[in-house]
A protein has these predicted regions:
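N-terminal helix-turn-helix DNA-binding core of bacterial DNA-binding proteins
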Residues: 1-32
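Residues in the recognition helix of alpha-helical DNA-binding motifs
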Residues: 36
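Generic structural concept
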Residues: 4, 8, 63, 97-100, ...
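Short, locally clustered residues in the helix-turn-helix/winged-helix DNA-binding domain
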Residues: 9-13, 74, 101
Length: 116
């Protein structure tokens, strides 16, 4: 499902991420993330490891099956973005990229304010 794909992508992009961090990124409560993670563990996509800094916490890592899925998702997202981007007239592409950059910066600023 989509949520599991988002989890796989975030774990793939940030190996060692915690359930708490995933919950914050995806804006899902920790118990919901834990349930989705448990399902991914059962399917051999993800493993939990004790944190090296604090053994009371666990970190999440992709197993080979999860890594393969992550790479496929990233590949598919790249080509989908490329396909969409190519529909934009060439002389407008730089504007679109600039607008996306500004949008991303605004999202990060709002996210930063939400964490204060």
């Amino acid at each position: 499902n989509k949520t599991q794909c988002f989890l796989i992508v975030e774990i793939g992009r940030k190996p060692g991420i915690s359930v708490k961090e995933l919950a914050e990124i995806l804006r899902i409560d920790k118990s919901g993330v834990s349930r989705f993670v448990e399902d991914l563990v059962q399917k051999d996509y993800v493993e939990r490891k004790p944190s090296l800094e604090d053994r009371r916490f666990v970190t999440l890592h992709l197993l080979p099956k999860g890594q393969e899925r992550f790479e496929k998702i990233e590949h598919d997202m790249y080509y989908k973005f490329k396909e969409v981007f190519e529909q934009i007239p060439e002389h407008k592409r730089e504007q679109v990229l600039e607008a996306l950059k500004l949008y991303n910066e605004a999202c990060m600023a709002v996210e930063g304010n939400a964490n204060d």
